Amino acid sequence: IGVAFWLLGSDFFTFMIWWEILWILGLVFMPITAQIFKGFDDNGWMYSKVIAIVICGYGVWILTSIKVVHFTTLSSIVITTLCGGSSIAYGIYGKQRKIFPWKHMELVYWEEVIFFVVFLLWTYMAGFHPAAHGTEKYMDFGFMKSMMRSTTLPSEDMWYAGKAFNYYYGGQYFAVFLTKLTGTKVEITYNLMRTMIAAFAFVLPFSLVRQMLKDKLGKRGRAWTTDFGGILAGLSVSMSGNLHYIIYGKIFTLLGIR
């Protein structure tokens, strides 16, 4: 945590708020997630964070879209609390016995460490070029700002004044949902959402491929082989897709390849 504060400076607190809310949401939604991932050693621990965001975020979106509630921080907190309460109730009354992977808590610990470190490193890297410039970044940021100002969905189109969005905005919406839920600012969470996705793109493939290798190899496989396979999967999804400039801009240039 000390290293995170040193790397991120004033952005550290927003980063920690997001990381903590993700941890809490994942914990609360384990009764549901464990039922889906009951064949996994970690009971889908890291997937629980994503499932929580999807369920709570979709709940807020649908109720706002049909004009039952306004899209505010208060409504986001209330609906998230109700969804979380439903998950806890399911765990208590749904005869779900194996909710937490007590026998594999070391695995859960290391998955959390991996998620935190990758999330931190991507956030630190994003700080070198945080501007919403290039490709669709300006539009993404504009959509998010529009939704932050609005209490209805879809929000007013920043390109076509007086009209609502006539474009898919799911990714931007979930970013704003988490922003309103945590009481943070789009100026920071615009990049934080991108780096969070990159962190999930590492740890989710890690969990999945590690489990696949363990199931495939059985007792023939050593612990380090399944873990190494999971790490390779995480690197392939989260890192390799961002190597275009390094490969084409640097390596090919050094090798004289055009």
Predicted regions and their residues:
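Membrane-embedded, hydrophobic transmembrane alpha-helices
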Residues: 1-106
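Active-site lumenal/periplasmic loops and adjacent helix-entry segments of GT-C-fold
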Residues: 12, 16, 20, 106-113, ...
